[in-house]
Each structure stands twice: as structure tokens, then as C-alpha cells.
């Protein structure tokens, strides 16, 4: 039987265990789905606190959270209740680091983009590039990497596009450190090395700036991030920044605007910057489905962080049960339910903003001006 004086077990010790054990990941379901240790069972912390009989008492229980802090306290409490429970030292991040040390997937990942995911990812990426004119000759693009699956895939796709070299353009793989904890920074840099992505990292103090903001800190953080990315990209001679928003982000944004904002709008494939003259924002994953990105990640056995915010373990606004996180989750679930009735629902939502008939709209905005159907009502009648 495994014994530990401080209730801790390392990754190496766990791998060498010769007794049966249960590995329990206590993070929320979304974080677990985003990436987890092979063989782990997901029982969120709240459920264990409500009913610890969900855990076995007849064998070793190894508890895991993101960084090993929350699961450490839980392990101690469970031991007081008679469980043989230990905490995985360093949590999920320690397992990620061990993966980086043992595996190098860059070549296989690149091959998978050209072969297995040619139709579902590569072709849709290039279709967006062409259809929306996202990349043009002599562009210098800052490919913005947050550390998640979307931006890392986008970086690999841009490398593949550059390899084809049909016209001249330059790339900078830009990572902004807004005040990451050591573990988050390490995961991002390790993934970049593993995938052979030459990143340029710069630091800001955004997390300190939003730390005491009670209302919508995530929204403020996102806005500040974009501003810093524009500024740094321009300093590096770039004329565009590329963000990793995908097809599902687009249709969710359309519905969120209608249901929660009372407006019809979409997430555009490209935008002119309002504060940085000559700069543009592009979204090359605009036509790529999130399910295919997850498939690519899992097929290549890649592991990324869900949110690089240093407060994720304790910040309620990062929780799927909070207002900030739950609205998009509600929309995701709504779309999934509607798809069961109509398989075309996602495509219909996406194309709805391409098929707007202004003659059937009560009013619309163009710049700072609001146009009512009454302004042209008489002219519409004369035209019939």
C-alpha cells in the first residue's frame, strides 16, 4: 500500500504504483473535457463535498486539480474521513510537463494537417483565407497565441500556408504574458517548443490591472489584451493580427447578440482597427468547426490549457456556473438541442447574417446613423 508522509504523490510515483488506485480529477466538466490525464475519472469538487461516497474507500484515491492546490486540501479532509487519499503533486500541470519532456509530435502534427485533416481543417482554413481575403502579398501577420487548442492549431496552419509560399508574406508568432503564473507560462512555452513554433513573448501587467474589478473582469481583460497585441504587433512591423476564433464562436456570438443583447450582429472575419491606423484583425479559423479542432488535438495526443488566467482555480468568473461563463454555455447547449431537431441549424444560423433583406428590417444602424423603414417607406411603395 502506498504511504506518503505529506499526502502527496508525484507523477513518477503514480506511474510505478503496483496497487489498484482511482485517479479523480476534481476540476469542472468543461476543464476536464478540454484536457485530462489518461484514465482519470471526473468528479467535480462540489459533488465530492456533497457526497464523498462517490469515492471508493477500499483502494487508493489520487486527487488531481489544475495545479495541486485545491486537491491537496481535499485529500487531507478525506483522510480525516477514513479515505486513503493523496494529492497529485503539481496537479494536471505536472502531468502536462511530463508529456512535454517525453514526446515530440511536431512532424506528425504537421503531417496530420496535410493528410487526415485536409478536408475538415486545412481546406476550410484556406477557404476562409481566399473567400474573405485575409492574407495578401507582403502582409506581416502577428499570429496571436493564447496557449489554447485554437491558437496553437492556427499557428501550425499558418506555418503550413507559409510552406506552400504562393506569395510573399511574413509571420510572427506572438504570445502576450499578462501576468501568468509560472505553471501557465511553462505550459505555453513547452507546447510551442514541442510543436516547433518559434514564439515571441512579451509581458504586460493586465492581470494586476483587473484583479480588483468585480464586474466583468474577463471582458475587460480581453479588451486590454487585444489593445496590447495591436500595439506590440505594430511595433514589430506587422499590419495584421490573427486571432483563433472559429465557426462555433461565430454562430454562438450571433445568437448571444439576439437573445441577450437584443441586436443582430456577427463576429466578422476581419476588421479594421479603430485605434491603430493601418492595422487589421483577421480570423482565419472562421470556417473551421470546433469539433474538428478537438479531434485534431485528441488525434495527436496534444494537451493545452483551457484558460491561462492565473486566477482560474479560484476565480468564480472563470467557472461554467458563473454569469460570465454560463451565457455562452447556455447558447452552446441551445444550439446542440436545436440540432437534434434540425441538423441544418448551425449552417442556418451562420448564413442568416449573409441573407439580411433590409426591406424586411424595422431599422438598422450604419456607423453612427440609425435608419428606420419609415425613412424609405413611401419610396418602397412607389417602386412596386
Predicted segments with their positions:
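Rhodanese-like catalytic fold shared by cysteine-dependent sulfurtransferases
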Residues: 2-22, 28-60, 66-115, 190-193
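A structural preference for short, hydrophobic beta-strand core positions in alpha/beta folds
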Residues: 42, 87, 173, 201-203, ...
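Catalytic subdomain that performs nucleotidyl-dependent activation
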Residues: 170-171, 241, 249-330, 334
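Short phosphate-binding/catalytic loops that engage adenosine nucleotides
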Residues: 82-84, 197, 302
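A short acidic, helix-capping loop that chelates divalent metal ions and anchors anionic groups
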Residues: 32-33, 96, 208-214, 315-317
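The feature marks non-catalytic terminal segments
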Residues: 302-384
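ATP-dependent adenylation/nucleotidyltransferase module used to activate substrates
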Residues: 104-256, 260, 268, 291-292, ...
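Short histidine/acidic/glycine/proline-rich micro-motifs that form metal-
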Residues: 69, 175-182, 310-315
Amino acid at each position: 500500500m502506498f504511504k506518503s508522509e505529506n499526502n502527496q504523490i508525484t507523477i513518477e510515483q503514480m506511474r510505478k504504483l503496483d496497487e489498484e488506485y482511482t485517479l479523480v480529477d476534481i476540476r469542472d466538466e468543461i476543464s476536464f473535457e478540454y484536457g485530462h490525464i489518461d484514465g482519470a475519472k471526473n468528479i467535480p469538487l462540489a459533488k465530492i463535498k456533497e457526497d464523498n461516497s462517490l469515492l471508493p474507500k477500499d483502494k487508493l484515491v489520487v486527487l488531481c486539480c489544475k495545479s495541486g492546490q485545491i486537491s491537496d486540501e481535499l485529500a487531507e479532509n478525506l483522510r480525516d474521513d477514513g479515505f486513503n487519499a493523496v494529492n497529485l503533486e503539481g496537479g494536471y500541470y505536472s502531468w502536462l510537463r511530463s508529456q512535454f519532456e517525453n514526446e515530440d509530435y511536431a512532424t506528425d502534427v504537421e503531417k496530420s494537417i496535410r493528410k487526415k485533416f485536409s478536408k475538415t481543417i486545412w481546406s476550410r482554413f484556406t477557404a476562409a483565407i481566399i473567400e474573405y481575403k485575409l492574407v495578401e502579398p507582403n502582409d506581416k501577420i502577428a499570429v496571436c497565441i493564447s496557449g489554447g487548442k485554437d491558437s496553437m492549431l492556427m499557428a501550425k496552419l499558418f506555418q503550413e500556408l507559409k510552406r506552400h509560399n504562393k506569395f510573399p508574406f511574413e509571420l510572427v508568432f506572438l504570445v502576450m504574458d499578462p501576468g501568468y503564473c509560472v505553471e501557465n507560462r511553462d505550459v505555453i512555452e513547452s507546447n510551442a517548443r514541442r510543436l516547433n513554433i518559434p514564439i515571441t513573448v512579451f509581458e504586460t501587467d493586465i492581470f494586476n490591472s483587473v484583479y480588483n474589478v468585480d464586474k466583468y473582469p474577463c471582458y475587460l481583460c480581453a479588451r486590454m489584451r487585444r489593445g496590447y497585441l495591436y500595439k506590440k504587433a505594430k511595433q514589430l512591423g506587422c499590419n495584421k493580427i490573427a486571432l483563433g476564433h472559429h465557426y462555433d464562436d461565430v454562430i454562438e456570438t450571433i445568437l448571444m447578440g439576439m437573445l441577450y443583447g437584443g441586436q443582430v450582429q456577427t463576429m466578422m472575419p476581419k476588421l479594421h482597427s479603430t485605434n491603430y491606423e493601418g492595422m487589421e484583425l483577421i480570423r482565419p479559423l472562421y470556417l473551421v468547426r470546433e469539433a474538428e479542432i478537438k479531434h485534431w488535438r485528441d488525434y495527436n495526443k496534444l494537451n493545452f490549457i483551457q484558460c491561462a488566467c492565473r486566477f482560474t482555480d479560484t476565480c468564480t468568473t472563470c467557472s461554467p456556473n458563473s454569469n460570465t461563463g454560463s451565457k455562452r454555455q447556455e447558447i452552446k447547449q441551445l444550439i446542440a438541442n436545436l440540432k437534434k431537431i434540425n441538423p441544418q441549424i448551425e449552417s442556418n444560423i451562420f448564413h442568416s447574417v449573409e441573407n439580411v433583406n433590409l426591406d424586411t428590417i424595422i431599422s438598422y444602424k450604419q456607423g453612427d446613423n440609425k435608419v428606420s423603414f419609415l425613412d424609405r417607406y413611401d419610396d418602397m411603395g412607389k417602386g412596386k
